[in-house]
């Protein structure tokens, strides 16, 4: 934790603190007391990933005149002289399109590059991570997060407050349930999470209101299991003026973008080149019925999730 404080450049008031057994029990009354000696408190960040992504998209579209399109898949990419021809497919209408580009940055997440570039894509290993949502605060964590230091498969878990409810997660499985585009928590993963909550908290029954799963795209090192693979990112040149971003975390999106631009344009972009006073547009829930109708007509809103 001292190293964690050092890397974060934390002020004295923000550094981690040791907490006695007595005070730990006062903070977390449902935490099991057997083998409990003490705990420590540290500060970390929390973000709403969905709203952050939507805020970034709004900023790109409204300030930087970018174009963001949903449900439009890249089916193939061909090189033609100094240009790339990109074949697109609309999932909603079945229409096909073709566009040209001088430069490409592919950030395709869990998916390989299409067509002729599939074999030269960055090699990835998928890891599924399931979560449970508990209604309210049944574990009495009192708006604090709890870091569970050790699981049966040598990992860690978190219990976190979230919008008036509690989130428990996560797992790390190579054989995830569902598809890459629609993963879901398996019974085994749900049982795993409940079992570990009961290991640390004095509760008989765990009732969850929902579960979900996400897929991490990790850089395949050919040797380690997913839980041992570093969560870093790589930026590789697939072809001239064509790079792929793979791996990484959402919290590093700005640094990853700068590195990608440096590599693609062979220019020294620096952090100070970014105008931080031009803040990301805040995503707010201010839409009314006319906005919904406009979104359905013009922005390929096919499901309630798309609109939200």
Q: What residue ranges belong to the model's regions?
A:
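A structural signal for short hydrophobic beta-strand segments in well-ordered beta-sheet cores
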Residues: 74-77, 158-159, 235
């Amino acid at each position: 934790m001292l190293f964690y404080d050092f890397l974060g450049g934390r002020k004295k008031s923000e550094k981690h603190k040791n907490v006695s057994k007595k005070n730990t029990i006062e903070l977390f009354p449902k935490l099991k007391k057997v083998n409990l000696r003490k705990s420590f408190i540290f500060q970390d960040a929390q973000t709403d990933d969905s709203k952050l992504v939507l805020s970034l998209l709004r900023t790109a579209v409204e300030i930087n005149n970018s174009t963001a399109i949903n449900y439009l898949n890249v089916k193939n990419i061909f090189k033609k002289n100094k240009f790339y021809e990109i074949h697109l497919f609309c999932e909603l209408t079945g229409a096909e399109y073709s566009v040209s580009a001088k430069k490409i940055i592919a950030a395709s997440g869990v998916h390989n590059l299409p067509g002729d570039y599939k074999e030269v894509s960055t090699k990835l290993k998928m890891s599924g991570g399931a979560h449970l949502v508990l209604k309210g605060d049944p574990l009495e964590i009192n708006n604090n997060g709890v870091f569970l230091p050790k699981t049966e498969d040598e990992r860690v878990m978190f219990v976190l407050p979230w919008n008036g409810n509690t989130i428990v997660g996560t797992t790390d499985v190579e054989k995830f349930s569902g598809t890459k585009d629609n993963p879901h928590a398996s019974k085994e993963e749900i049982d795993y999470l409940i079992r570990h909550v009961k290991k640390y908290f004095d509760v008989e029954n765990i009732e969850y209101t929902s579960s979900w799963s996400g897929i991490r795209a990790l850089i395949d090192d050919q040797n380690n299991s997913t839980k041992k693979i570093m969560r870093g990112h790589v930026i590789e040149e697939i072809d001239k003026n064509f790079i792929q971003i793979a791996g990484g975390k959402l919290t590093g999106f700005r640094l990853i973008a700068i590195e990608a631009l440096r590599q693609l344009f062979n220019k020294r972009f620096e952090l100070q080149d970014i105008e931080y006073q031009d803040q990301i547009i805040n995503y707010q829930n201010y839409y009314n019925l006319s906005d919904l109708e406009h979104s359905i007509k013009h922005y390929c809103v096919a499901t309630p999730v798309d609109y939200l």
